């Protein structure tokens, strides 16, 4: 299923990602997270493991311009937004918001968590706009020693009307 969105006179869509997107996802990781790009095996895992919501944003030419993965942990009662990124030239068009919203909509659990570099205020603002609250920090989480801010959202309204199990 492709969801097309009209934003700032640009068209982009959101659809499921799969292993065929590995090359484009590697490039997106390299560009978006030069200090923290996921290794190849982790990318293969996120594109193939069961229980992962994986969505890509595509431009008018079908090129992958954004990606999000949500790790649904049913037995633990929550999900993690494992990664989300949008190529720099496409930022500010609502693509990150669209990816996050679409991923959350496919997660049928009441709690969603994520972590973000404490030195990434733009991403932190996005998550706060979506109702994520600061829960703590993980010191030295990133390879360069940077801290991760752990954030959490309780999807109370969604859970109440959808009847999540």
Regions found by a protein language model. Give the residues of each.
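Acetyl-CoA-dependent GNAT
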Residues: 2-3, 7-12, 16-91, 97-106, ...
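Well-formed, non-transmembrane alpha-helical positions, independent of function
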Residues: 24, 125-126
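Short glycine/proline-centered loop/turn elements that form peptide/ligand docking sites
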Residues: 96, 100, 119-123, 140-145
């Amino acid at each position: 299923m492709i969801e097309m969105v009209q934003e700032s006179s640009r068209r982009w869509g959101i659809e499921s990602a799969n292993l065929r997107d590995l090359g484009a996802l590697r490039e997106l990781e390299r560009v978006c997270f030069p200090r923290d790009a996921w290794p190849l095996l982790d990318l293969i895992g996120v594109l193939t493991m069961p229980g992962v919501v994986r969505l890509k944003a595509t431009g008018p030419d079908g090129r992958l311009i954004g990606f999000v993965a949500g790790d649904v942990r049913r037995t633990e009662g929550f999900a993690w937004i494992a990664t989300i990124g949008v190529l720099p030239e496409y930022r500010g068009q609502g693509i990150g918001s669209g990816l996050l919203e679409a991923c959350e909509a496919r997660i049928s659990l009441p709690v969603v968590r994520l972590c973000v570099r404490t030195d990434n205020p733009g991403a932190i603002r996005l998550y706060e706009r979506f109702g994520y609250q600061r829960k703590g920090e993980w010191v030295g989480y990133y390879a360069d020693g940077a801290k991760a801010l752990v954030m959490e959202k309780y999807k109370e309204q969604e859970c109440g009307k959808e009847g999540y199990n």
